[in-house]
Amino acid sequence: MKKVVFVGSGAIGTAIGNVLARKGVDDITLLSIEEEVVESINNLRYNLTYFPNVKLSRNLKATTDKSVLKDADVIFMAIPSVAVVGYLFDNKEYLNPKSIIVNLAKGFGKCDCLIPDCLQGHFPNPIMMMKGPSFAREIINRQDTGFTLACSDNQYFSEISELFENTNIRFDFSNDITGVELASILKNIYAIIIGMLDANYDSANMRSLFITKSINEMRSLMINFGGQEISMFNYCGFGDFALTSLNDMSRNRTLGLLI
């Protein structure tokens, strides 16, 4: 039996946690700092803050007790990127060294470094990245969703992919941790600019021109910082770029539309 803990009870943690709980994985816990969210999940089967209209699986539990980390087989980090590194260092005493840590957050870590770079050499745990075009609302509503799993050691890919077998979550795989991280960060910048273009010009020609230039620039930046060009063709690359830049559910695109 796998014991899975999601650090964070926000939209993405709740959505992916509910996927596993609905599958029948016995021990799925959201570790939260929000007492009201914990109470609403455990007592009402709803996350009233993030998904007030979605009934959650009875297998999904929530707690504020960090001791649940000690026995976890897999820990998903579902908190903002700027908090991931600090959280892991501050709570190192609770971490099982054999737990697989899977980072869901998209963005820079402490001191504007990539999160894997901040963690490297400080934890014995296997550390994986899980990035892709993934609106939490669609995940929890059972829409098929693709993620790229990135890790330096291939043996852990099967453990995570088997966990999600027969669910609406699909995977591709990469050893290019730097490229996967950069792709998940850079697309946010271009999404804002594409939103600005669409708000001010609403030109299909101009949008297509800028998308082409953006993809080429992302590719160059990834290569220059040690990533691999092939990562642009994973879910974390063009897939996440397209979702974030061209869909009005995207917060970054929406910001651009409002500027």
Describe the function of each predicted region.
Residues 83, 94, 121-125, 144-231:
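Internal alpha-helical scaffold of NAD(P)-dependent oxidoreductase catalytic cores
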Residues 70-71, 186, 238:
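Alpha-helix C-terminal capping/helix-to-coil transition sites in glycosyltransferase folds
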Residues 135-136, 198, 241-244, 248:
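Glycine-rich phosphate/pyrophosphate-binding beta-alpha loops
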Residues 56-58, 64-144, 160:
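Rossmann-like NAD(P)(H) cofactor-binding subdomain of soluble oxidoreductases
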Residues 1-54, 61-64, 90:
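NAD(P)+-binding Rossmann beta1-loop-alpha1 motif at the extreme N-terminus of oxidoreductases
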Residues 248-259:
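Divalent-cation-assisted or electrostatically stabilized phosphate/pyrophosphate-binding catalytic cores
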